[in-house]
Amino acid sequence: MVTMSKQTCIELPVNPIVLGKLGSTYGIRGWLRVFSSTEHAEDIFAYQPWFIQRAGRWQHIELEAWKHHNQDMIIKIKGIDDLDAANSLTNCEIIVDSEQLPELDTGDYYWKDLIGCQVISTAGYNLGTVNDMMETGSNDVMVVKANLKDAFGVKERLIPFLDGQVIKKVDLATKTIEVDWDPGF
């Protein structure tokens, strides 16, 4: 538990998830750019409280204000009132408890749930493990780290997350994803 003041106690996230990142400073009064990983950028503000990790320690940050500025979103964090204080927060990841995230419709998945899944081709070949996810604009892409003894000598595969076309079955209980994908790619 992190104590912020005599009146306020904030519970640390039990199931932490990164929802964004603090960017460069804006102005001299402690404002920062914020980069959101949520589907709609502004949705990041619906998930509170926010935490960051600095020097291996959790720190609660309280949002004072936010606004659009040109193509960016900028935020003011309570207690961060000058350029030096804001600079100390640049590149920190914004973390919340994943329990706050809404339930998804059938066939929709959070990236956090796909990372770590084994990817198996429809022919039964183990293509590797989902190591990361990427957004390309047209569709999400799984970054699959191949097994050490991959028969095709591949170290990493980029497999588009196209439901029905490439993705045949996702089983989060067994952490497996069945794909129609050539192991040679």
From Swiss-Prot:
GO annotations of cellular component type: cytoplasm; ribosome
Subcellular localization, as worded in the UniProt entry: Cytoplasm
InterPro entries recorded: PRC-brl_dom (IPR027275), PRC_barrel-like_sf (IPR011033), RimM (IPR011961), RimM_N (IPR002676), RimM_N_sf (IPR036976), Transl_B-barrel_sf (IPR009000)
Family: Belongs to the RimM family.
Notes on the domains: The PRC barrel domain binds ribosomal protein uS19.
Purpose: An accessory protein needed during the final step in the assembly of 30S ribosomal subunit, possibly for assembly of the head region. Essential for efficient processing of 16S rRNA. May be needed both before and after RbfA during the maturation of 16S rRNA. It has affinity for free ribosomal 30S subunits but not for 70S ribosomes.
The protein, known as: Ribosome maturation factor RimM
Organism: Photorhabdus laumondii subsp. laumondii (strain DSM 15139 / CIP 105565 / TT01)
Source lineage: Bacteria, Pseudomonadati, Pseudomonadota, Gammaproteobacteria, Enterobacterales
Name of the gene: rimM
